[in-house]
C-alpha cells in the first residue's frame, strides 16, 4: 500500500496523476489483500495513457525525504479509517474470521510498521514483485486490439531473473463467534460473516464469487422477501451491504447493516444461513 502511493511520484517530483489529467484521463489505484491495481479511465489518447501506466509501474523515483513525508500522509489515512465506524466494523469482523493471520492486520499497516518503512524496503519490494510475469493488463471499451498488441510488441523486452513466491496456507484458528466495538454512532451496526472452508483454484474463483453474490443477494438483498419484511417493520434500512471475497487461499462473505435491533437480526441472519 505504501509503495502504491510512492509509485505516483515521477522523477521530476511531479505527481503522476497530474500527467494523466493533462491527457484527459482519470487515474487511481488501490491495494487489496492480494494485489495492487493501477487504473485509468479515458475517452482519448489510449496509447499515451498506456505509456504513463507503463512508466508508473516500470520504475521508482522516490527519495528518503519523500518517503518521510508519505509516512505522515499514510498515518493520517490510517487515523481516518480508525474513526470510520464502517471500516472498523469490517476489519474487526475480518480479524475474528481469521485470527492471528495477515488478514487480521489492516492493509494500511500499524502506526509502528508505517513509521519503520524505509526507501530500501520499498525498492526491494518493487524489484522483487513489479515484473511483467506478475502483472495482468485489462482493457475495457471500444478498443482496437491489434493496435494495442502492436504497441506492446514494440516495447523493449527485458531479461528478468525469475522470482518464485512461496504461498503458505493460512494457519486457521477457530473463528471468534461474537465480539463488539464501542464508538459514537447514530445507529447500532451489525456484521454477520462466514469463513469459507477448503481451497478454490484461481480458475474457479471468478465463478464461485459470482455464485456466492447471487446466493446471498437472493437470500438477503433488497428484492428478497426477508429484506422487505425487515425493512417494512423498521428493523433494517437501505444500509445493508454485501462483501464477497474469493481467493485461492481464502474466501469469506460479510453482511453489514445499521439496525436498532442488532441482537435479534444477528440471530435471524445466522439462522437463515444455517
For the regions a protein language model found, what residue spans apply to each?
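Charge-rich, well-structured scaffold segments of protease-associated domains
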Residues: 6, 10, 15-164, 216, ...
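His/Glu-based metal-binding/catalytic segments typifying zinc-dependent metallopeptidases
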Residues: 161-225
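Short, conserved beta-strand/beta-arch hydrophobic-aromatic motifs that form part
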Residues: 1
Amino acid at each position: 500500500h505504501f509503495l502504491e502511493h510512492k509509485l505516483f511520484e515521477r522523477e521530476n517530483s511531479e505527481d503522476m496523476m497530474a500527467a494523466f489529467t493533462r491527457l484527459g484521463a482519470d487515474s487511481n489505484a488501490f491495494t487489496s489483500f492480494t494485489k495492487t491495481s493501477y487504473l485509468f479511465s479515458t475517452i482519448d489518447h489510449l496509447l499515451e495513457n498506456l505509456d504513463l501506466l507503463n512508466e508508473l509501474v516500470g520504475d521508482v523515483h522516490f527519495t528518503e525525504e519523500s518517503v518521510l513525508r508519505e509516512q505522515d500522509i499514510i498515518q493520517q489515512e490510517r487515523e481516518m479509517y480508525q474513526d470510520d465506524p464502517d471500516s472498523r466494523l469490517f476489519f474487526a469482523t475480518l480479524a475474528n474470521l481469521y485470527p492471528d493471520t495477515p488478514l487480521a492486520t489492516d492493509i494500511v499497516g500499524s502506526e509502528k510498521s508505517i513509521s519503520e518503512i524505509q526507501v530500501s524496503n520499498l525498492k526491494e519490494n518493487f524489484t522483487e514483485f513489479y515484473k511483467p510475469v506478475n502483472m495482468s493488463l485489462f482493457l475495457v471499451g471500444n478498443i482496437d486490439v491489434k493496435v494495442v498488441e502492436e504497441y506492446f510488441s514494440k516495447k523493449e523486452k527485458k531479461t528478468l531473473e525469475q522470482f518464485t513466491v512461496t504461498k503458505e496456507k493460512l494457519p486457521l484458528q477457530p473463528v471468534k463467534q461474537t465480539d463488539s466495538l464501542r464508538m459514537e454512532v447514530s445507529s447500532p451496526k451489525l456484521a454477520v460473516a462466514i469463513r469459507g472452508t477448503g481451497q478454490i483454484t484461481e480458475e474457479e474463483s471468478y465463478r464461485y464469487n459470482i455464485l456466492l453474490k447471487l446466493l446471498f443477494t437472493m437470500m438477503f438483498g433488497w428484492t428478497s422477501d426477508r429484506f422487505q419484511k425487515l425493512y417494512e417493520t423498521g428493523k433494517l434500512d437501505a444500509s445493508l451491504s454485501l462483501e464477497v471475497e474469493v481467493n485461492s487461499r481464502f474466501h469469506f462473505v460479510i453482511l453489514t447493516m445499521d439496525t436498532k435491533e442488532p441482537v435479534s437480526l444477528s440471530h435471524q441472519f445466522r439462522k437463515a444461513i444455517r
